[in-house]
């Protein structure tokens, strides 16, 4: 049950008679890769692990224990606990080498601050605990260097550059409302690169279109946490095309140079872009958030282009059977013009987005 599962990382045969291998096989037959979501640093009080090793959890002796989300944090300063947590991941990957992705979650802060292992060295707990986590992650990375892992911690609570040595991406926030995400992703990108920022299309804020939600997520590492049954035929087609476009352009988006053009904190719109290092390809994102009545719409001035090159402008990520109303669409401009004069891409529509591809000719 949910009250006693954390810590006991064993397959429930009554629920999964074929175990994880059957899930991996089923996913493969459906044409997708299989990923798994784990929270190996935590333990529930009614788990077999806690009953066998109560001294493996961080908790105060002779005090009433406070349970956050009915869980405790394992004491990663303890080498035996490090071995256990490594073993959780190692066993899964050893038995299921085709597992293609790990989401590593951490949903509780450290409470009941006391390490049974450190005894009279309690002042070292926070430091030794974090070092223990990184020791585990290094062992995993050394043995399984090609398995991508996402770090999630109640959202983005544990994002740091040391973690980037071991994780391929961060879950920026549990808030996936696309309007809020514009602000979150704008701020997050001040510190971390786009390729480290997970951004998923979800059901939050259904007042916004699937296109808008997808265009917001596609400015980072695009993903979907959305049931296909929630989408109509046109929306499914749109998502398929948007994923194809993102996949085609992801080298520019994830590895190109990022330019923040219009901040959402300064008004009712947002825009940023990515340009390839050779300046031959760029992707421009524009978002209308909550335009005011009669608001003057200013052109978006691009950056990072070659002033002497000519660029073909093309709006992509369009809904089926719709046409672009972008005045610059399918036209060619010099990089100098695009950076000094710009493109009239903003509109007076609420929660409206454009994705624009620029190609040097």
Segments predicted by a language model, with ranges:
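Catalytic cores of secreted or luminal carbohydrate-active enzymes
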Residues: 211-262
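Active-site-proximal loop/turn and secondary-structure-junction residues that shape catalytic pockets
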Residues: 38-44, 106-110, 153-157
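Carbohydrate-binding surface patches
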Residues: 263-307
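Conserved, mostly hydrophobic/aromatic
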Residues: 27, 85, 149, 217, ...
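Active-site groove signature of glycoside hydrolases
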Residues: 84-118
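Aromatic-lined carbohydrate-binding/catalytic grooves of carbohydrate-active enzymes
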Residues: 1-87, 96, 101
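C-terminal beta-sandwich/jelly-roll accessory domains of carbohydrate-active enzymes
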Residues: 290-361
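Glycan-recognition surfaces
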Residues: 44-45, 49-83, 127-230
